[in-house]
Structure formats: structure tokens, C-alpha cells
Design a protein with these regions (language model features):
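Short, contiguous pre-domain boundary segments
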Residues: 8-21
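Conserved hydrophobic/aromatic pocket- or pore-lining residues that grip, position, or stack substrates
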Residues: 34, 51, 83
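Zn2+-dependent cytidine deaminase-like catalytic core
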Residues: 64-173
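Active-site/ligand-binding-proximal alpha/beta "capping" segment
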Residues: 179-185
Length: 185
């Protein structure tokens, strides 16, 4: 029998991991949340070492995501994809910046090729990245897939600003912890 629906969830602990009423005004606070989510996901054994959060123009939290690929047996359950989905469901729009102005995505690590593409379609205007793709591959053993040689330039052409290396050392530590455990799928 073919399945007629897909049901993806965040782990129960995720609601205790952040203050939904907090003001995440600066980029460091946004990135800190993404890295915290990635670390908690590893600590709880609820998925891979990745966290992401979507923020409104005012710095308010719209949605979060953590990697849930293994628990849900689906390759699309990356942290960024989960953050997009929870945010899109919350605001009931597939293009997050359609009516709200500039939207920011903070990620614990550079998006893989799938999440990179989804960032364009989800309506992201700013992308805050912690660890680099080479960190993900060397420390945790993941294959991030093919990205355009000038991936930053491609995003810039679409009006998406990229800021890298925010809390990179903290994000790298989470990846290294996960990599040492040998849990790469």
C-alpha cells in the first residue's frame, strides 16, 4: 500500500530549548540558538548534529528545526527543511518573506545541496551559517552534495545575504562530538 501522507515531528524536548517570546535581535543570538538546537539533538539522541531557526524581520522566532532523518526514515528531514516547514505551517505561506519582509535563517552548519536550494524557494533573505561544509564532512563524515562553485554569488543574485563562521568553533565541537560517536547514516 502506498502512503497518502507524511508526518514529521520535532522531538518533545525542543519546546523547552528556547524562549518563544525572546527577542533575537542580533545575529549572534540567532546563531547561538541554532547551535544549541544541534547540540541538544545530539545529547538527546534524537537525530543528527544540525539545528536551524527562522526569524522575522524584527528578530522574533518563527520556527525551528533539528535533523530528524533517521528517526523518520526520510532524507528530507534536515534541520533547515524542518525549520522551513514549521515556519511555513505557522504563517500558512510557502514563501516566508512574501508578506513579512526580510526573513533570516540561522543554521548550525552550512546547508547541504538540498537545503541550499530550498532556502531560495522558502523565501529566505539572510542566511547565517556556523560550521562550514568542509567541517561537516571532515568532523562528522556527512556528504553535503554538490553545490555551485560560486554558491554565495548565486544566492546574492537572488537577494540572499550570507554571513559565515558565526559561532563556528561551537558548531564544530558539536559535529566533532557526533563524529566521534560514529553515528553517520
Amino acid at each position: 500500500m502506498l502512503y497518502a501522507q507524511v508526518h514529521l515531528t520535532l522531538p518533545a524536548w525542543v519546546h523547552e530549548a528556547f524562549d518563544a517570546s525572546a527577542d533575537y535581535a542580533d545575529d549572534d543570538a540567532k546563531r547561538a540558538l541554532a547551535v544549541r538546537l544541534s547540540a541538544l539533538n545530539v545529547q538527546h539522541g534524537s537525530g543528527g548534529p544540525f539545528g536551524a531557526a527562522v526569524f522575522s524581520p524584527e528578530g522574533r522566532l518563527v520556527g525551528v528545526g533539528v535533523n530528524r532523518v533517521v528517526p523518520h526514515s526520510t532524507s528530507i528531514a534536515h534541520a533547515e527543511m524542518m525549520a522551513f516547514a514549521t515556519s511555513q505551517q505557522r504563517v500558512q505561506q510557502f514563501r516566508l518573506n512574501a508578506e513579512r519582509g526580510p526573513i533570516t535563517l540561522a543554521t548550525s552548519s552550512q546547508p547541504c545541496c538540498m537545503c541550499y536550494g530550498a532556502s531560495v524557494w522558502a523565501g529566505i533573505d539572510r542566511l547565517l551559517i556556523g560550521a562550514r561544509a568542509e567541517d561537516v564532512e571532515s568532523l562528522a563524515g556527512f556528504d553535503e552534495g554538490p553545490l555551485p562553485a560560486d554558491w554565495r554569488g548565486e544566492l546574492a543574485q537572488r537577494g540572499i545575504t550570507v554571513v559565515t563562521d558565526l559561532r563556528r568553533d561551537e558548531a564544530r565541537a558539536v559535529l566533532a562530538e557526533y563524529g566521534r560517536a560514529g553515528k553517520v547514516y
